[in-house]
């Protein structure tokens, strides 16, 4: 069976924004104050608490521009936070809605047609494993079922390479 991990936005992307960098549209992030649930941070994968400042910006979780490189608004704590590390466990922010879109992408970062499905939260790990068990799927996105905003990525857990011991 395919083992999976839930992957947050890379720390290098978050640090660039925390340090005054620009978003995917070459704009500075906007700062707003959270009014409570509904502002999931894509770096720590936790909801941003009411009263905390957050950054809103355009994000493109793909390595290059191409027709399938969806770009959309996401949130990030304004103050640096630790990147989500319990990758084998479904992140807390994915328990705040009844369902999400789960969709597979190929090695060349294109949507694999027929894989996108509005998926109940309890079924996300199983559907992610099912998709990643296919040879044509390189990774999976979890996106908002209401607004299509990127939430996190699901990757296969790769087996460690056996080190030569010299024995």
Which stretches of residues belong to each language-model region?
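N-terminal, charged amphipathic alpha-helical interaction modules
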Residues: 9-92, 99-101
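A short secondary-structure junction signal
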Residues: 87-88, 114, 153-154
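C-terminal edge-of-domain segments
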Residues: 150-158, 165
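Contiguous interface-forming segments/domains that mediate binding rather than catalysis
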Residues: 111, 165-167
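N-terminal non-globular leader segments, chiefly Sec-dependent signal peptides
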Residues: 1, 93-112
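Short, hydrophobic/π-rich interface segment
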Residues: 103-139, 143, 156-158
